[in-house]
């Protein structure tokens, strides 16, 4: 194909109840198929012929149909690892963690008190993560600013930005740092042994010996400073984190989520903004900044995580010799306190900014949130993930559908929010009105009471459990290293209870117990206890307000002007001088001597043998099947790619709607809710999406593909093909009510997502005028697409027939055998 660029655009695979991507699966099927819905007599679209054709495409080799094959998650590790020679550490716990196929160790460094977790297996993508509990006392953003600042040079690597140089000679697979509401982490990953050691060295030096004590300019650059280039200029605030958080506070969803935290947990670190509130960031002093590091960035407050195939004993010895042995154990008061339960539900309003051209009508967020326990009980946590699926996330979910049917807002979101000491569950409606608040709460209560009284659909529960178990066993995190995600998972218990470090890696028992107890009223009891009879809850409304940004900026300008007026000429000149010195610091070049200290990989450190990827093309019935032979732990990954070159220009944006409709409307034999549950109950999901490839002619050519992706165990292959056929050939595209619901949801989500990623949206739009790839992206996922969705939703009654006709045209143009390219990945 000559493809040099692959853009996977809004692929809606059913990856489950993640807060940013909800999608799931479907129901049992009958063999009797009537496909006149779309084919109108076209032989190419007869599903019977398609069944035979698809089967033939995938029968080009012998297949292992062993029904007893077990889906294994993670990387297998058969041999036990022995940690016997590390006298500097006390081994507190050792166990075989079968759920993730690893040997787990929990250690404590004797001299410094550092906690250390080892997960040893054969994964060559090694991960190191050092985590500190960093509970903020206010919203000055000190934890966030410190996360930026420690990476601006250290004792052994005194560059202004050592990581710019480091990545030039690194093969890292992950290199970053993250601030959470109660912790800060510094993870790295690499498949190369020497590279991994280099990364560990730079990160350990950064967190324990940063240059922040010698160079105040780092704090001023990364946090905040007064900017005054000339005495007569207006005084301004500036700083990396300050500007970053100004952007974050302009996002409606971030403003709302932040307020929910603040209202639910007013007496804990979750009640303030760890990232920093722009109004509060300038209150942070350099002295308090340094004190925060001195208090929390000590080995006694650290949680060190090592994962993968490495010489663990050697790494432990290195950490002891180079860093941990330099510190004595101290007591660090960083324990996260629990919020005292409320006696009654609290209510609060928060305003978020909208543009002058945006409407304040039908733009309110209604939310109801409940604290549902703590994160230490893995079975309970998993049960709430299932309830997320059952109540809200799955299409047709009863609480979601009840709110939509009541005409409250245009989209429903929310779900289970974990990753903190006290997880909570939120029901959120977008594009609503303030006057709908009481109706919103009434519908929630009536729907939940009905579910408790009549019982939850057991098929929905089974689908939710199977989906979550499939995802856990598969442990596929896309481009993120598996060990990185495990290091985040263990923090959900380890940081709050030293005796429960591995509980979120051992979930299979919880899944088994939930399957057994699902029919005994477990989930109904949880709803009654935590959602109906729980006073520790909050109703938070997010209200749009025009001119809010201008209003806030004016207040800031007036505050700065008043402060400037209070300064003497001499003080103003000092500010000018500090501004000049900061710019001089930023513009100065690191010395060659300093750059030379950054560890770089040598050729001898890199193996000569590249990782062999076996891609074997097969030509069957006139189509190409590309087989990838990889270790998939018994899972088949199948992608059907349909070339869309026959699609006329005026229909391109409608492809974005089509991929949002397929699988989310009724078919010949199922409601969309039934389909969704059945697919999740028996596979890893089916999803539709659009991909674009840069062609050989880099300037004027691109290849556009409509994809159908799925993953399943081999014994479920026939079922999966039947479900794909059900979706592609019997989808009901004439259900006006459902089409309008989907358009409304699309509009609400696009309004939030495009605004939240404004820079990316603008870049895509600008590039669309000269790049075919960007033009396609914009028309199916950007501003061009939003304009179509907005127009169709606004004038639905007038344009619904055009919409339905165009969707049917696309079905006929795209899903033709001659357009098909198959990619299949198996370990056989």
Language-model segments: which ranges?
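His/Glu-rich zincin catalytic helix
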Residues: 74-163, 187-194, 201-204, 250, ...
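M16 family metallopeptidases and their MPP-like homologs
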Residues: 125-135, 161-209, 216-227, 254-279, ...
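Intrinsic disorder/low-complexity segments enriched in small, polar and charged residues
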Residues: 3, 12-16, 36, 51, ...
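Low-complexity, intrinsically disordered tandem-repeat tracts enriched in small/polar residues
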Residues: 16-18, 23-25, 30, 35, ...
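Intrinsic-disorder-associated, low-complexity terminal segments enriched in Asp/Asn/His/Tyr and depleted
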Residues: 8-11, 18-21, 34, 43, ...
